[in-house]
Amino acid sequence: MSKKSFVKGPSGLPKELNNDKQWNYSLVNIWVASLALKLLLSVGYHSTDFDVHRNWLAITYNLPISKWYIENTSQWTLDYPPFFAYFEWVLASFVPDFVKRDGCLKIVEKGLYSLPTVLFQRLSVIVSEVVLFVSLQWYINSSKTHTEAKRAFVVASSLVLSPGLLIIDHIHFQYNGMLYGILVLMINSARLKKYLMCGFWFSILICFKHIYLYLAPAVFIFLLRAYCLNLNFGKTKSSNILKIVRWKNLFKLSSIVIAVFSIAFGPFIYYEVMPQLIERLFPFNRGLTHAYWAPNVWAIYSAIDRLLIQIYYRIPISRPILLKIFKFNPQYLWDTKLVNKTTRGLIGDVEFLILPTITSQLTFFLTLFYQVMALIPLFLQPTFRRFMGSLTLCGFASFLFGWHVHEKAVLVVIFPMTFLVSRDRDLLGPFNLLVSCAYISLFPLIFTCDEWLIKITYMLLWYIVYYFSLKKVVRLPKTNGGYGKVILDRVNNGYILGLVPVITIVSLIDLFEHKFEILRKLQFMKLLIISVYCGIGIISSWNGFSWLYFVDESIWTDE
């Protein structure tokens, strides 16, 4: 391959490296174009999460701060950290009088509202999402070369146009765009080696939504190793031992983190309601899986349990074998109510009928184990790309092995991995498998006919556009990987294409279940199909990404 020739810029440096930037990649046009679709969707379907946030507006508007985490008139109690409660309080102050009269700010058991409340809350999501656009524009603008800026633009545009955000925020109803915007601020601060800003933004993010604790181990190790520790040993061993900690840096970072958490939790400590707040944030009395199984290890485990139940019923010769292997109580299998309990995410303990019951302690141990495995290389090599890889694997571990994981939590994996995918073409395989399975797994959140065509068409167009866009800008690997790599790519693409019949089957069940009683009895089957198929895909993506993380050193340097 011939060496690339550079044209000299005004400063005497190669034009590709010249600081006088000539490019302009703006997200403004994308924001304007996407705004039209979001406004059209604003009057369509919304989930119960809409009334959740309406109730939080009412709580923070009508009650003193000391009552926010105690109020329980509605089942939709406030269970996000304080900064999100403050956000709802600020938002409530902008509610117009005609929206107030519509019932937006009334504390009631079940919200009674109409179009004015819907439009106000929909617009609040759209406006708050500006944080994501601004943070990603900063990410693009801070690129050092034209090639880097082009890659950054593809990455940024794929995130602001994410089918996940469209489904979860603008149809289902949540505020993830704003929160992931703060995550991007943290990520770009780390990229620019602004470690204090990195700690500041992540502390704020945790105080907005505690799901990002999934990523905390990677952030902690990165800041500790890159900013607070000095492990460059010299000749004088004794002096190095004394100076292994950069005390000034540690003090500055600790002060920022403590200050943020003090502002967030200080008022609740003062009013002595911290126990109630902690109980709201961490309700450990919930089951292993959510009502709709998130596509992770436990979805597959649950499906195997139900498969073994059917084998036990239909193949009598298998009964003594299953009893000997799994040592379960066969009396439970003849309890019709227990067997027909197709959802496992309701309040209470989770009991499997044949397979051993999974405890919260086991899920914590598995999550911690796989996170620690990802943290070791980060501690030894605290580069930005290694940090992003560790961040991705911490998200994977929490999503795949965590307790009571929601399907929406898969965005915690997608966002950090997206920032890495343009680094090396080998990452495209795990990435494509992840996003295709993850976004399809969100489809059951939107089960109405009016939005069916939108979610299918939007997902398909997004995947086609960014499949080729990322392929065009991605860095080629140093080795082609041989015939085995070709086979693996074909298997990945084949599995992704398998999502087409999966969606077709599920859609046909939706279409004809009102006509056929047998389909009504198999109502949970369509959720199981999506959870299991997408779960296998996401686990495969995790395996492929982990292999590259631990084996391919060239991807993770900052060169």
UniProtKB/Swiss-Prot annotation:
Q: Which Pfam families match?
A: Alg6_Alg8
Q: Where in the cell is it found?
A: Endoplasmic reticulum membrane
Membrane topology, as annotated: Multi-pass membrane protein
**Pathways per UniProt:** Protein modification; protein glycosylation
Key words, A-Z: Endoplasmic reticulum, Glycosyltransferase, Membrane, Transferase, Transmembrane, Transmembrane helix
| Chief location bin | endoplasmic reticulum
Chain ranges on the Lumenal side, renumbered to this chain: 1-24, 97-122, 174-203, 271-286, 385-394, 448-449, 515-526
Which reactions appear under catalytic activity for this entry? an alpha-D-Glc-(1->3)-alpha-D-Man-(1->2)-alpha-D-Man-(1->2)-alpha-D-Man-(1->3)-[alpha-D-Man-(1->2)-alpha-D-Man-(1->3)-[alpha-D-Man-(1->2)-alpha-D-Man-(1->6)]-alpha-D-Man-(1->6)]-beta-D-Man-(1->4)-beta-D-GlcNAc-(1->4)-alpha-D-GlcNAc-diphospho-di-trans,poly-cis-dolichol + a di-trans,poly-cis-dolichyl beta-D-glucosyl phosphate = an alpha-D-Glc-(1->3)-alpha-D-Glc-(1->3)-alpha-D-Man-(1->2)-alpha-D-Man-(1->2)-alpha-D-Man-(1->3)-[alpha-D-Man-(1->2)-alpha-D-Man-(1->3)-[alpha-D-Man-(1->2)-alpha-D-Man-(1->6)]-alpha-D-Man-(1->6)]-beta-D-Man-(1->4)-beta-D-GlcNAc-(1->4)-alpha-D-GlcNAc-diphospho-di-trans,poly-cis-dolichol + a di-trans,poly-cis-dolichyl phosphate + H(+)
The transmembrane segments are 25-45, 76-96, 123-143, 153-173, 204-224, 250-270, 287-309, 364-384, 395-415, 427-447, 450-470, 494-514, 527-547
Q: What is the protein's given name?
A: Dolichyl pyrophosphate Glc1Man9GlcNAc2 alpha-1,3-glucosyltransferase
Quote the gene name from the UniProt entry. ALG8
